[in-house]
Amino acid sequence: MQSMTIFNIITQLVFLSKTLNGNLSVQPVFQTLDGYEYTSQSFSQNLQSESQLEIVYEWKYLDFLYSTFVQRQQSILNGDFVPKNNLPLGIDVHNNRLFVTTPRWKNGVPASLGTLPFPPKESSPAIKPYPNWEAHGNPNNPDCSKLMSVYRTAVDRCDRIWLIDSGIVNATINLNQICPPKIVVYDLKSDELIVRYNLEASHVKQDSLHSNIVVDIGEDCDDAHAIVSDVWRFGLLVYSLSKNRSWRVTNYNFYPDPFASDFNVYGLNFQWLDGVFGMSIYYNKKIMERVLYFHPMASFKEFMVPMNILLNESVWQTNTQEYAKYFIPIGDRGYNSQSSTSGVTRNGIMFFTQVHQDDIGCWDTSKPYTRAHLGKFHNMENSNLIQFPNDLKVDKEKDQNVWLISNRLPIFLYSNLDYGEVNFRILKANVNKIIRNSVCNPDNSYINTSKSAFVLIEEGQCF
């Protein structure tokens, strides 16, 4: 057990006393936490009034842009398009286009990747298949050179979009691997195919599900690596563009936490044993290296590993046990803080989804990963603006934005969506505006004290 300083004990007892007496009007005081000096303020009220989340698109159900009305009707009649079986999962942004993935969870999904214009011209547009209809295969007559079931994407600084195509259809009924999982890359300037790479069979386990992808660019655009998460068999696949080769990375921190595997949302109770999922890459000033921040979906913790460990292929061809020490936990978000995806801004602000809380959170990566340094934004009871935030991206604009897809996935999987109301949303917020009054603003010098003293003791002092 780590010892507590007398100052921290007194601070927490005073806070507990005021909390029990119902007196929450605490004047700002200066205190030191983890080597930083802060002004104690409750920042959550400021965030609620200035959340700055803006609805870009919303749908009761999805539609696709067919060449003619007759083609659309024919697709519905033959079962290729069943509107209620389509759900948006992944989001990405490049210039004046949004990219949305629609994996083939069920029958009747005609295309698994499409685009939408930005700025929007209407509130609920049909999705235009990307790059065209011909690029998408039919699961009833599979052509594995085509796109089958794209889960998520990554846009890099070289104007390319990277896709992870799971090759799995009907995952909600009977997991059917009809094509090998593959990485596909398109040139966003020409929309031409650049790369199609099937993951090596020896790296794909029984019931593997490859569901997320991030990309690291070195000194030039050829020095690129994609990192793909295997959420059901708890591994990472690293692909080298220059070598056109991949390797599998394993570590016990990729596994789900049983205590975080129980979900209770929207009146539904279910268990997800999803392993490593959320990933983002940034330069860590403390160790002076680029790192991969990651977390399993069924977890309350965040981890990191130096990128040079992941990108060294020879490490993963020998005894990997000696490298386990480089995969380290950096902090805990707290109970019911499961997160799917994350993204980091150019100045080191990480945003992450909070799927159990219908919210997004943030963290300034230059500060310790403790709950005192984690912010929330939406944080409003009885609001349906966000319902299961499933994917999140930070764009590459000069004035950056954070983008979010809310899609009610558990209801889609385990119950029935009400198609008389809005089920899916794409939302965005300007980064500078949304963090202005938050603990995540690097220019602010206060911490999150809007929780009980018991949480402060649990997270910061007694391990």
Curated annotation (Swiss-Prot):
- State whether keyword Signal applies: yes
Task: Report the locations given in the UniProt record.
Answer: Secreted
Q: Does the keyword Membrane apply?
A: no
* Coiled coil regions, renumbered to chain: none
Q: Which family does it belong to?
A: Belongs to the major royal jelly protein family.
> EC class of this enzyme?
isomerase
Task: State what protein this is by name.
Answer: Dopaminechrome tautomerase
Pfam families tied to this protein? MRJP
- GO MF term (any one): dopaminechrome tautomerase activity
Pathway(s) where this gene product acts:
Pigment biosynthesis; melanin biosynthesis
Q: Could you tell me what this protein does?
A: Catalyzes the conversion of dopaminechrome to 5,6-dihydroxyindole in the eumelanin biosynthetic pathway originating from dopamine. Catalyzes tautomerization of dopaminechrome to 5,6-dihydroxyindole during eumelanin biosynthesis. Acts both dopaminechrome and N-methyl dopaminechrome but not on dopachrome or other aminochromes tested.
GO CC list: extracellular region
Q: Which organism is it from?
A: Drosophila melanogaster (Fruit fly)
The alphabetized list of GO BP terms reads: melanin biosynthetic process from tyrosine
Q: Which UniProt keywords apply?
A: Isomerase, Melanin biosynthesis, Secreted, Signal
EC number(s) per entry: 5.3.3.-
Q: Which Gene3D superfamilies match?
A: TolB, C-terminal domain
Q: Which reaction does this enzyme catalyse, per its entry?
A: dopaminechrome = 5,6-dihydroxyindole
Q: Which InterPro entries match?
A: 6-blade_b-propeller_TolB-like (IPR011042), Royal_jelly/protein_yellow (IPR017996)
